[in-house]
Curated annotation (Swiss-Prot):
Gene3D superfamilies: Immunoglobulins, Low-density Lipoprotein Receptor, Pancreatic trypsin inhibitor Kunitz domain. The lineage of its organism: Eukaryota, Metazoa, Chordata, Craniata, Vertebrata. SMART domains: KU, LDLa, MANEC. GO terms for cellular component: cytoplasm; extracellular exosome; extracellular region; extracellular space; membrane; plasma membrane. It comes from Homo sapiens. Keywords: Cell membrane, Cytoplasm, Disulfide bond, Glycoprotein, Membrane, Protease inhibitor, Repeat, Secreted, Serine protease inhibitor, Signal. The record marks 260-261, 401-402 as: Reactive bond. This is Kunitz-type protease inhibitor 1. It is found in: Secreted; Cytoplasm; Cell membrane.
Amino acid sequence: MAPARTMARARLAPAGIPAVALWLLCTLGLQGTQAGPPPAPPGLPAGADCLNSFTAGVPGFVLDTNASVSNGATFLESPTVRRGWDCVRACCTTQNCNLALVELQPDRGEDAIAACFLINCLYEQNFVCKFAPREGFINYLTREVYRSYRQLRTQGFGGSGIPKAWAGIDLKVQPQEPLVLKDVENTDWRLLRGDTDVRVERKDPNQVELWGLKEGTYLFQLTVTSSDHPEDTANVTVTVLSTKQTEDYCLASNKVGRCRGSFPRWYYDPTEQICKSFVYGGCLGNKNNYLREEECILACRGVQGGPLRGSSGAQATFPQGPSMERRHPVCSGTCQPTQFRCSNGCCIDSFLECDDTPNCPDASDEAACEKYTSGFDELQRIHFPSDKGHCVDLPDTGLCKESIPRWYYNPFSEHCARFTYGGCYGNKNNFEEEQQCLESCRGISKKDVFGLRREIPIPSTGSVEMAVAVFLVICIVVVVAILGYCFFKNQRKDFHGHHHHPPPTPASSTVSTTEDTEHLVYNHTTRPL
């Protein structure tokens, strides 16, 4: 019996070598597909759920960085990744990220990328990113944000009856009684979410008063009462700031940030109790950072670095700037999405990162600040083949209330049309004369509008795992086929050997040897590899 086992092992040895080699190849290939960004922090989607929350990818456009940041978009970071879907996964693990912009390597296909940029395209719930045509880039947006953008483009150049100042805005306010909101003519306000004790009163056709607001968030739906726009609605969020939130939005020192852009902004000075202008660099700012002075005043009216009298007459004491308690690291082991994780696992508020003052025990919050600067600089250096990006902007009446006749360009009809300009803010798709409008935007059509062309599929985690499973099954089938071939070949040799040279063993011994050999082959081909 022992010699038979030895012979069986000897016969199987040649088959074992290619089997092991193939198994190692399959295993290494499988391991290579598992690399990727770290798992998402608490509250953020990961894996297949993450990838499924993004669009397939809009090709042929690049972010107009200066215009987007000027509108309120936020550059988050530029991680080093190898593939497009890794960039999307990095967006999933980054708080407030809703755009993953991928720069492709020339002539290397869709999965070889040169750079990855993560952006927050929302400001006050509005989509504020702007794009310009440029080959070699793919944009992945969260489906929710992309859907809002497409709805905006679908409404397109017909306009909306919702006053511009209130379309999708997110108000930050101090506790006050009542909150008076002006320029709301022809709108009905209905509470969708929040404390139901709040009352909406209209004592003037042009303004509403909100009574009973407490700390927390309220969602109102505005509906146009004008017959010209019977179905127009918009949501407005009102957040009554708590003491802790007021520290962030009103008492934090103005923070230029590490990036070297130049964007005019407003911040609140609690010492003088006024809003002041400053120049924002483009990244790593804090919440005391407003696009318009009106927002700043509404959020921080009456806040000072000492006693503050609330609507109920109680005294609320605010420190000069964020409390020292919030500057101390918390080493509980779990960081919130709004916190920065130090290298030693401790947590600090995210606005303390790269503020030129080490707040982590190991100073890791000041160790990698150049990555933001280099990523933002690279994004700003991208050139556009055309300077006609304003020609695809929707006509913007602005925030003022004048009635100035102007012309705007419609890329779908490739003609210019009239609209009424309010006199301030707005955009550059705004011309005094029709001929000036046509000459400025000649050649621009719907193909230049972001998001209305074909999309490129993005591999999901599920599809990658399926590909890995198929690859593994193929490897196993090949191994089994090789082993089977070698086994039957050796069996055939045994048959011819027995026919010409009968072995000097009893028949029972021959049967036992054959069963033993089959037993060994079965174990070798079916045991876990």
